[in-house]
Amino acid sequence: MMKLKKIHNLLYILFLTFFTFATVNASDDESFRPPGRFVSIGFQTMYIDCMGNKSPTVLIDVGIAGSSASWYKIAQTLSNNVRTCLYDRAGYGWSDPGRGERTTATIVHELNLLINKAEIPGPFVLVGHSFGGFTARYLAARFPKNVVGLVLVDSSHPDQIYRLSALDKVKQKPLVTGRKNLAPEDFSEFERKWYFLNSSRKATLAQMGELKYFKESAYQVKHSGPIKDMPVAVLSRGIGQLPELDGVSLENEWQDMQKDLLKLSRNSWHLIVADSGHEIHREAPNRVVENILKVVNKSKNSAK
């Protein structure tokens, strides 16, 4: 009986191995080839997809465990008016795993190499959702001549670790874009494939690395220096996501930090999207598009 059980377990393992192998091979099938480009930055290959050809270039970065696929329709809409680029951070989607600590400084270094190797023309309007807001801010501070506008979508704040420290007292989901079990129903087959790539082992390791070094990333962003006076749109959620603990409304703390982002520039504005939670780009895409184009237009007027 024990021998039969061992054989059964062995067959089950072999089946899982075959199923995994078949799934991996399916991802290499030409029908799943993405429309963008694979670009070598020397020590790894990264994926980027740019649409449209009008300046400036809108460059979008997502939150931890987020998916570029969830921004695809927004990118397509924007491309009618402006060049728009989506990319996969190291370990996400079709990009190779990254090297070193997964801090914002590392991410921006890789992104800058990608921009140069892919010969993506500036200037840039940077869009950052959640943790991607760190990328946008750090890049703007480090390369001020190339960045003409920012759009921060329910962005992380460098002080959130301390101002939301009460969350350590309870079990809770990380303050990042959560990965759902199923892709959104309105995703195309291509977008679903992109989405599920972020459930792979390499993507999970990338997400864990970014969470591990979140504190270092926050420090880097806070001390990256001021950005030049440019159009900055701050979009924040209207539907609360955080509890009240020890008599403190953590959601109010979050909103206060969103308002604090207005200090980045004298040419900034704040929009609370009343009917949206954290994933504003999914729940209110038109508001995101409107504000990105507003930043684009203001950046053009400033350049005159």
Positions of PLM-derived features:
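Bacterial N-terminal signal peptides
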Residues: 12-20
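Conserved HGGG/HGGXW glycine-rich cap/lid loop of the alpha/beta-hydrolase fold
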Residues: 40-94
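Active-site loop/oxyanion-hole signature of alpha/beta-hydrolase fold enzymes
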Residues: 49, 86-127
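Alpha/beta-hydrolase
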Residues: 60-62, 87-89, 153, 236, ...
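Conserved hydrolase catalytic core segment
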Residues: 121-164
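Flexible "cap/lid" loop of the alpha/beta hydrolase fold
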Residues: 151-180, 190-193
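Conserved serine/cysteine hydrolase catalytic core
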Residues: 186-272
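Catalytic active-site module of serine/aspartate enzymes centered on a nucleophile-bearing elbow/loop
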Residues: 266-304
